[in-house]
Amino acid sequence: MPRSTPVASEQVDFVMKLLGNTTKQITTATYIKLAWAVVISCNTGSNDTVFGITVNGRGAPIDGAGEMTGATIATIPQHGCILRVWSLPRMPAGMISRERVQRLLQHLELVLQDLMADPSCKVGDLPRMSRQEWDQIQRWSGTLPPVSRQCVHEIVNQRSLQFPNACAVSAPDGDLSYAELIRSANAVAAELLVHGVERGNYIPVLFEKCKWSPVAMLGVLKAGAAFVLLDSSYPPQRLHTICGGLKTQIILCSKDMYARAASLGPTAIAIHENAAFLADIPDVTFPVVSPENAAYVVFTSGSTGTPKGAVIDHQSYCSGALAHNRAHVLGRNSRVLQYASYAFDVSIMETLSTLMAGGCVCILSDLERHDHFANSVQRLAVTHAFLTPSTARLLMQRELPSLCVLVLGGEAMSLADRSYWMSRVRLMNEYGIAECSVASTIREVSHVEQKDIGFPMGVVAWVVDQNDHEKLVAIGATGELLLEGPSPPVGRSSSNRAGSGRCAMGSQAGSYKTGDLVRYNEDGSLSFISRKDSQIKIRGQRFELEEVEQHLRRIDEIQEATTVVAAPSDRPKQPYLVAFIVPRARESFCVCSARALIPHPTEEFRLQAATIQTKLHSILPAHMVPAIYLPVNRMPKTSSDKIDRCRLKEEVGKWSWSDLRAYSVSSMSHRAPSNRVEQDLQRVWEQILGILLDSVGVEDSFFHLGGDSIIAMQVVAEARSRGLDHSVQDINQLKTIKAIANKIGDVQRAAIKLVQNHAMLRARYVRQKDGAWKQFFTGYTEQCFRFSVHQVKSAQEMRQIIGESQTSLNPEHGPVFTVDLFHHGGEQSLLMIGHHLVLDLVSWRIILADMEAMILDPQHQPHLTMSFQTWAHLQAEYGTRHLEPPPGQQPCSIDEPSMRQFWGAENNANTGGDSKTRLIRMNDDLTRKLFGPSSQALDVEPVELLHAAILFSFVNTFPQRPALVIFGEAHGRETWDSSVDVTRTIGWFTTLWPVVAQVNPSDSLETVARTVRQARRAMDMHGWTHFTSVYHNTRQTKRSAGAHLMEITFNYAGKFQQVEQDGSLFRMEPMAKQNLFDGAAELGRWAMLEINSVILNGLLEFHVPYNRGTDEARVLTPWMDNLVKCLEGLASGFA
């Protein structure tokens, strides 16, 4: 302990009223010393005190000391032993307030008065605090909060009557209004009653995160029973232990959990959309439920090795919920995140308390909780969240405009946590235990130094002597927190219940000893100090060390075992659960270190540790399985013959993390990455775990390297940002980089390779000072494109993700290319989205071909041709030197005002957001005839045939109007030099040119087809020469910048052979067809109407975007109807 010199900052003068000395054998000084020892003992919790006293020094055994001149005063330690327990209290300098000094002196005066009035009194009967302190504590804790006499489901019923159509539950599998929630819950309750459920029964509930879990909870309550939430991630043995203790007869479950639930009890009832009992509710009478009846049971860790259950009744929960809802500012407009695992009571508060307030429960799927946490919170517009500080850190640096209230608990907030969140939300620090209705104290954090757990809510809090719960401790002294409320937990062991001692305030109340040590602050708030016993909490999850040890000792390979929570020397803020093991097989020790407490590791012990860990994982929840296993020759003991946990903890603190890892099975072989994905994953693990790159082998277990569930979420988020998409479940199950890299799969590897090969998929654009735009390429980095994997259950969910991916494109900052892989119903869908600035339809053919080849053969190296930038530079140079811009303006059929008037869009903007799209799809027979006999008979290409049909139908629909000048679109990859090869180059090469075909309404279709053929073929290089001379000529560029609005553009995309051929890896999804020609809402359109045609799955389709102001009935519909008739006539006339 570092030396420190106390410095007095102020002085308190206090005059005491003392009684006359009643006996000559005891001096006043002795009384004062004894009284001061008692006061120190009461205020520090120590039964053995040491303090300094000042003496005159004349009593020293020195001749003539009494007649000496000069200062002889001295300060000596005074030992006042009250009991035999030794404890040296330590208090940092500057931590004693003036008010506390005043209380100490008042207490000293009271103790002195009692001592001097009755010198024969027992020390234990002396007052433990001053009268002023007693009065203050009574003011803080003297009144019990109001007790609710309602049941949980009754309050939710009231909300359904008030807001029947309001959203009660928003979940991955759908939403429920309050009316739908109550109707479904009534159906579940009726089904339970039909199966013989009675009041007082316990009903386990086994669901994944879905909308049916709140229905099941309310259904059980309405049937008069109590629910028990089961966590589906728990090992089967633990679930069997819980259900066996409840004597389970009926289990409610989801459809997916039915097989597992059926193994836990005689009868499993699955709740799902098509369950018959939801549609046909039998006529049954629901039982009358008393507020004293049990509402739910929550199981926590037990020191005997068996989980122990706390039973919470309706009265207790409702009283607590009404109090914490007020503190949380929860109401009907609240959208509360349901994040916690069903194994923890916070999940009950997130669900039931929200419904009692009339809010919406926003349920995240397990995939969203672990892999898409921040995005899901944002998407659901969550207003309230209850998280641990570690989990909340995953939301930092994210825009969460809807989040209003953030309640943190389960572990201490750091200064950084308080600093970050205080300015963004109403930040609250909360404390609670499962046995007392989830939440017991709360503090709204108003400045960064606030560390306390706040004030009681819904309960009365007392700080009592940890050895005698009937004695209060002084303000500022450490004691055990005792909570007093409507009733104690009715199903818990009586060992934690407190009787109506001096601190109890009424016979109707029940008190519960929490086992947590706290102290009062000056304002009556409470500060958490530590646990009284061996129950511990790691990353917000509380459990008993004894339970872990019980299971360890039952393993055959272990002779003796104990556990501690300790942090390595190089990770002081990362505590781990460490198991110390005395193995039965002595060969697990290194002979040369037999005398050391912790011997050197051996291969035998590493294998043994792996076996032990596997066995524990099959029995215990993951957070209760030790991360580190260390062999010991013998367990160190204290003088009282108990295991010396302090020494074991100190031993761990001497070792670095890499030293401790030497005892794990992963140290047996350290293998380097063998491919790019493994290398990238290794870098992610190094960064998040905070260890050297060389320390991470591809076959090392994530958990042996120090990972946990929260760190796994950080790893997944960082890996995704680098294009390596996997899930927390993958880490939990696969554990190693090698296995995860294999799981990431061929699709992601192919996508990474695609972006590495084609620079345009890494293009960015910057606007320069003169307003011109400049294109550049980024090098390949993890952020240069986005790859995501999604588990979806509906087309609606997929559409939402598609929309998010589309809006994520950003040509300035990236990405310009995204890949989403969807898993749904045993199938996979691949969504690729590229910005039109960097690719065209020919580019998509290249992308599909490359992706298919690289998925089928990871070693495939696609042939690359000239880069887009090189081509663009050469084209501009050629255009400037050799091409003359055409004279005058671009040809058009009519002027723009007349054009707008004709279409009925005089006053409308012409952007993507101001457009609508009409889809025309021809059948397969007509498509086949058009591109076979019809084209051959007229001696035209398919694009010329379609162009002719469009023009012919227009002039016949509007004979009084001048014929259209249709601007044709082409792929633009014609080259002026044979050395220029862009056949496999990704980029936007599209050209546009006016096709001037002079036709009349009296012309036949054959005549129009020949005219169109002639006009299109007369344009050099499919319009490339014209387009380049206008737009890629440095002498013409500025003059062309304000080019006029085109009336009609026509593009024939042809046939996507990669998705048409038998055996092709890809096939086009119907959803993708609808988005094939999609554009941004704010993007200006260059034509009044665009006709895009393509053949998909053997069917000719026209996608026709047009201005929203278009007079459809007068103009568009008659023309499109005539176009279809024209195509039908072509197919039948030339078949």
From Swiss-Prot:
Corresponding gene? Answer: NRPS9
Tell me the segments the record calls region Condensation 1. Answer: 23-77
Q: Which GO terms describe its cellular component?
A: cytoplasm
Role of this protein? Nonribosomal peptide synthesis (NRPS) is a key mechanism responsible for the biosynthesis of bioactive metabolites which are potentially contributing to organismal virulence.
Domain Carrier stretches: 672-748
SUPFAM superfamilies tied to this protein: Acetyl-CoA synthetase-like (SSF56801), ACP-like (SSF47336), CoA-dependent acyltransferases (SSF52777)
O-(pantetheine 4'-phosphoryl)serine PTM positions = S709
Ranges for region Condensation 2: 746-999
Region of interest: Adenylation? 177-562
Q: Provide the domain comment.
A: NRP synthetases are composed of discrete domains (adenylation (A), thiolation (T) or peptidyl carrier protein (PCP) and condensation (C) domains) which when grouped together are referred to as a single module. Each module is responsible for the recognition (via the A domain) and incorporation of a single amino acid into the growing peptide product. Thus, an NRP synthetase is generally composed of one or more modules and can terminate in a thioesterase domain (TE) that releases the newly synthesized peptide from the enzyme.
One GO BP annotation here?
Answer: secondary metabolic process
Name by which UniProt lists this protein? Nonribosomal peptide synthetase 9
Task: List, in alphabetical order, the Gene Ontology terms for molecular function in this entry.
Answer: ligase activity; phosphopantetheine binding
Instruction: Please give the InterPro entries that the UniProt record associates with this protein.
Output: ACP-like_sf, AMP-bd_C_sf, AMP-binding_CS, AMP-dep_synth/lig_dom, ANL_N_sf, CAT-like_dom_sf, Condensatn, PP-bd_ACP
Q: Which organism is it from?
A: Aspergillus fumigatus (strain ATCC MYA-4609 / CBS 101355 / FGSC A1100 / Af293) (Neosartorya fumigata)
EC main group: ligase
